[in-house]
């Protein structure tokens, strides 16, 4: 089986200013990807898979999105992370789920965050769901 620990496009801006994250670390069962920015300004993704019970696997996914700004120190402009947004997702799948079952779960996650759907629309507008 091929490794899933590969670089991928996290933010697709149509090829202009895309954010790509690359494998950075794998320790204690936690995979980490970061963008090429300095660590303090980098986009960061972590993922772990644990056996949460005798019958379930639990995937924990975390994404950090920095707001990069410029700070002037002694007349020199330096990029800094002004703040960060965090996404935390947990997914529990029974160990007896088939590959087809798991593919359906992935499609549901993709549909959940598809442009135009209520949740990403509310997030993009920094508003509530009503």
From Swiss-Prot:
Region ranges (Viral RNA-binding): 32-105
GO biological process: negative regulation of viral translation; regulation of translation
Places the protein is found: Virion
Paired cysteines (S-S): none
Keywords linked to the UniProt accession: Capsid protein, RNA-binding, T=3 icosahedral capsid protein, Translation regulation, Virion
Classification via SUPFAM superfamilies: RNA bacteriophage capsid protein (SSF55405)
GO molecular function: identical protein binding; RNA binding; structural molecule activity
Effect of residue 79 to A: No effect on the organization of the T=3 capsid, but with a loss of thermal stability. Complete loss of infectivity
GO cellular component, one term: T=3 icosahedral viral capsid
Record family assignment: Belongs to the Leviviricetes capsid protein family.
Complex formation: Homodimer. The capsid proteins form dimers that assemble by group of 5. Twelve such pentamers are linked together with free dimers. The homodimers binds to the viral RNA via an operator hairpin, but also to many other RNA sequences in the viral genome; this interaction probably shifts the virus from the replicative to the assembly phase and ensures specific encapsidation of the viral genome.
UniProt function note: Capsid protein self-assembles to form an icosahedral capsid with a T=3 symmetry, about 26 nm in diameter, and consisting of 89 capsid proteins dimers (178 capsid proteins). Involved in viral genome encapsidation through the interaction between a capsid protein dimer and the multiple packaging signals present in the RNA genome. The capsid also contains 1 copy of the A2 maturation protein.
Official protein name in the record: Capsid protein
Organism lineage string: Viruses, Riboviria, Orthornavirae, Lenarviricota, Leviviricetes
């Amino acid at each position: 089986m091929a490794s899933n620990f590969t670089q991928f496009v996290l933010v697709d801006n149509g090829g202009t200013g895309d954010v790509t994250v690359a494998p950075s670390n794998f320790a204690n069962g936690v995979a980490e990807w970061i963008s090429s920015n300095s660590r303090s300004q980098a986009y960061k993704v972590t993922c772990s898979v644990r056996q949460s019970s005798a019958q379930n696997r639990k995937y924990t996914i975390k994404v950090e999105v920095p707001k990069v700004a410029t700070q002037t120190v002694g007349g020199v402009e330096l990029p800094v992370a002004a703040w960060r947004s965090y996404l935390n997702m947990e997914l529990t799948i029974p160990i007896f789920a088939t590959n087809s079952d798991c593919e359906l779960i992935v499609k549901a996650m993709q549909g959940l965050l598809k442009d135009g759907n209520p949740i990403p629309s509310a997030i993009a507008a920094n508003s509530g769901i009503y």
